[in-house]
Amino acid sequence: MREIVFVTPTDERNIFRESVGPLLLATILQSKGIKSHILSFASFGSPADFAEFMETGVRRICEKEPKIVSFYTRSDCYHIMLKMAQLVKARLGCPIIFAGPQADIIARETLEEIPFVDFVCCGEGENTVYPFFSSLLRGEPDLSVDGLVYRKDGDIVMNPRPKLIEDLDTIPFVDYRICPEDEPANAQIGFPIDVGRGCPFGCTYCSTKTFWGRKYRLKSPARIVEEMQRNYDLYGARHFTFQHDMFTMNKALVKETCRLIKELPFKATWNCSARLDCIDEELIDVMADAGLYHIYLGIETGSPRMQKLINKNLKLEGVRERIAYLLSKNLQVTTSFIFGFPEETEEEVSQTFSLVTDLLRLGGVRVQMHRCAFLPGTAMYEEYKDRLEPAVGFSDMTGGVGVAECGDLFRDHPKLFTYFNEYTTELRTKLLHFPIFLNSLLSMRAVYLYLAEKYPRDRLIQMYFDFVEKNRGVLEQAELSRDEMVALIRENDLFVKSFTGDPCEPMIADAYRLRRARTAVSRGEMPTATEITCVSPLELDRGIPVNRCKAGWYMVTYYLDDKGAVKVQVRHT
C-alpha cells in the first residue's frame, strides 16, 4: 500500500521524462517516511482508446490503495485529469488534491464547479507539501498552510501563496526510485535538471509571471554541475535538459556554470531556453564550448508593432544573423511563433511568415507555430475574457485527445477550459486552417520555400489563402479530423499540383512524389531526375529516393542517427 499517489500527464515511458515538480514533492514526502508513488499517463496505455486508457489508469491508481491522490495538472490535460479524478473519487472516496500550473491559476473556479476535488495546492510546494499532507493523513488537515485553497461553509477560502524559495540550492535531489519499478530508465536523453525558476519579462500571452511573480532565480553553478555529476554517477546521464524559462538572463552565472561543466570528468551535453536579446556571440561561444547542443527561442511574431502590443519587445533587426551564428556553432535551434493575435493584421501575419521562411532557408532551424490561445493568468485573457465564446473542438493545447469523451466537462464548465474559447475576428476565422498549411510547409519544405518566392514578401499570407482555395474540397469536410485532413492533402496536394508549367515542375513533381510515397520503389514510381539530388532538408524529408545516374540505379537513404546527425547511405541496386 502507498499512502500518496501522484498522477502525472507524462506520456513517455521513461522515468527521466517525468515532471520534476511531482518528483520533488514525492521525494520530500518519502524522506519524511510517507510512502509515495508516481503514476504517469504513459503507464496507462494509449489515450487513443480513451475508455481503456481511463479504466487502466483508475485501476492502477486504486491498486495502490492510496490514502490521498494528487493530480499534477497542465492546460493540455485538465479535462483528462478531472475525468480520472471523478472515477477515482467514486471508487476510493479518498481526498483528491489538484496541483500544477492549470489548477493553480483556476483554483477558485475548480473548487466552485467540481465537487469531487477537495483541495488545490498553489505555488511552490517544497516547503508546504509535508505539513499539509501529513496533517491530512492524520485526519486533522492543517487549513492554515500557505497556498491551500479549500471549501469552508459553502465558501472558497484561498490562503496566501507560499513565499518563493530564495535559495534553490536547498531543494533536495530527486529520488527516481519512487517511480514504478517496471518503468524504463533511459538516461541517454535530455535528463531533466531544474536549474532555476521565473522570468522577469511580462509577455501578455504568457502565465509564467503569474506563478513566479517575475522573480528570476537560478541555482548556483556549483549545484547545477553537482546534479549533473550525481545523475551521471547514478544513471549514466550525459545529456541534460536545463529546465528554466529564461536560463541565460544572468550571463555571469551562465558563464560560471559553463566553466564548471567543462571540468566534469565526462563529456556533457545540454539544452536550454532563452531570449534572443539575452544571448550574444560571446555567450554563444562559451555555451557551445561547454556542451550546449540545442536552444529554444521564443520569437512569436515578425511584426515590430505586435512585438510591442504583446509586450515581448524583441528587436527584430539581426534575428536572422543571430540564429545563423547559432547554426554556425553546430547548434540545433527551435524557434516558436504565434499567429492570430487579436489585433493582428494580414500584413503582420505576412511579416511573421516571411521571417519564418527566412529562418527555414538557413537550414537546421525547427519552427513551431501556435494559434493564439487565451490562457487564464495572462494579461491577454484578462483583457478579452468577457468577449470569449466557447468553441469546443481541436485545440493546440490538447490536440483531439479525450475531447469527445469529455464533452460534458467542456459544456458544463467553460471557465475551466479557456483554451477552447474563441475570440472571433475576420482574420482569425480565415486562419482556421493555418496549422494544416504549416504542416504541409514543414513536410515539403524545399518545394514550399521555392513556391513562396513567387509571392511578394509583404503579402506572403496570400500563399496560405491560395493553399486553402486549392484544397478546399478536403478542408471543408467537417467530419474529418485535422490529422485526416493532413493525410489527405499530403497524398494529393492540389496547391502544389497547381503550379503547372513552372520551370522547376519536374523537380517539384519528383519531390512531391517521393515525399508522398516515402519509398518510391514500393509504388513502382521512378523519379525522372538524372542525378542524385537533395531536394529538401534531410531531417524532414528522409524517404528513400532512387535516382538514375551513369553508374546505374542507386538507392540513397537519408536518416538521422541517435545524436541528430544527418547520415547518407548509398547502395548500388
At which residue positions do the language-model features occur?
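Glycine-rich beta-alpha loop elements in corrinoid/cobalamin-binding modules
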Residues: 28, 37-164, 377
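C-terminal accessory regions of radical SAM enzymes
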Residues: 4-14, 149-152, 347-496
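Structural recognition of alpha->loop->beta junctions
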Residues: 110-127, 289-294, 354-369
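Acidic, low-complexity/disordered tracts enriched in E/D and polar residues
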Residues: 482-572
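A short, glycine/small-residue-rich beta-strand->loop->alpha-helix junction that serves as a flexible
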Residues: 11-20, 73-78
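Radical SAM [4Fe-4S] cluster-binding motif and immediate context
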Residues: 169-334, 339-341, 354
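Residue-level recognition of beta-strand->loop/alpha-helix junctions
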Residues: 8, 38-45, 72, 210, ...
